[in-house]
Amino acid sequence: MSNLASFCARYSQQTMQLPGGAEFSYRYYRNPVARATVVLLPGGIGLPDLFYLHFERFAEHYSVITFDYQEQFTTNAELARAVASLLDGLDKHVWLVGQSLGGVIAQIVAKFHPERIEGLVLSNTCSLARDMGQEARDELMSMVENQRTWKRRLQLIPMPVFRRLMAWAVMRKTR
């Protein structure tokens, strides 16, 4: 098992230019004997390197892709389109593994780009199903409103500072 620094050295960031000119940065390990590719989608802070232990474990058997939620994609729909473009560029059909907000992104990508998706693994997220009951819908809307409140508060902290603080706090717990 490695630490984050050796992980980052082993699996360096790559960049792809998407149609329309946006650049998309990601980490990708192509396992030559893999039968499937896994895309790891982190939660709301969008720090994929927090999944580095998962990435390494999956890389033993699968090809693995992960990326942060880059600021040029301002809505979940834009990010989902960018993910689909990335997968088109890599010519990959994938399993999406989404945690929290990553689960929402996974569902959006799967809904609008099913031709690229082999399956979903969702954790600690909500359902985007149409047949959701009123109680579940009310709870989801309450969570969204709570996130909006936190987002307004967090906008006072510059995103690079916030991300470093979150990474530091999480990595402290994994030592």
Please provide the spans of the model-predicted regions.
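Conserved HGGG/HGGXW glycine-rich cap/lid loop of the alpha/beta-hydrolase fold
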Residues: L18-F73
